């Protein structure tokens, strides 16, 4: 947006907003009311004042206005939609889903369509975004106990429709994620309800689940880690001992962490699928790289053969 503004000539901006001429206000006092319906008279009586030279202050004000708008929009997308909070490791839609499920919790499964409807009280971005986020959380098998066809992360098959599948909070989530006494609250988007600013999670969910989001001007990508490895790392940290921890993926695969750089910017990982040759015509794929599916892997093998 800034580049687009800078490409417009200053003279054109001045002409665009200040091209009309106006008479002195003293001359308007004696104007005949019948002339107000005349289009020529209306053009002469414009509220704009003539500008005979470049007005730098006006152009500066315009660019500043666009800069503020951009920052407001970028901040909204970063904080309210795309990037997880480091304290609980959750994006706003994930936090609102868990909060809604906690309010609904009675120990029994709820239809996903029902959960989505309740979450819309807190998340004003439509049912599709809520449903997709809920399925992704359910497939990670940590915070949500699922029932029904929730898709397959290995094959890429999608989950069944929300009216056919059910979910409830896992025992782990009930024990670790919620504590109303230590939760800071804020009003929901319409002011009718209260929602948590962050959840007082007692486990590093950001590292356990991983997160990926694309915002305005930045992106985040945190890879998932093994549950037991995180527990061991926490113990070493509390004891003041050195430790090393690396990502681990639910889809398996062989990993090269030589360029991981402790997960900092510029680090990289290599993950390879595990393929066994059964016979001259059959390959058995038992592990695949994270975020890939068997369908995409088979397609890449086919292209390599061709």
Predicted regions and their residues:
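Intrinsically disordered, low-complexity segments enriched in serine/proline and basic residues
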Residues: 6-13
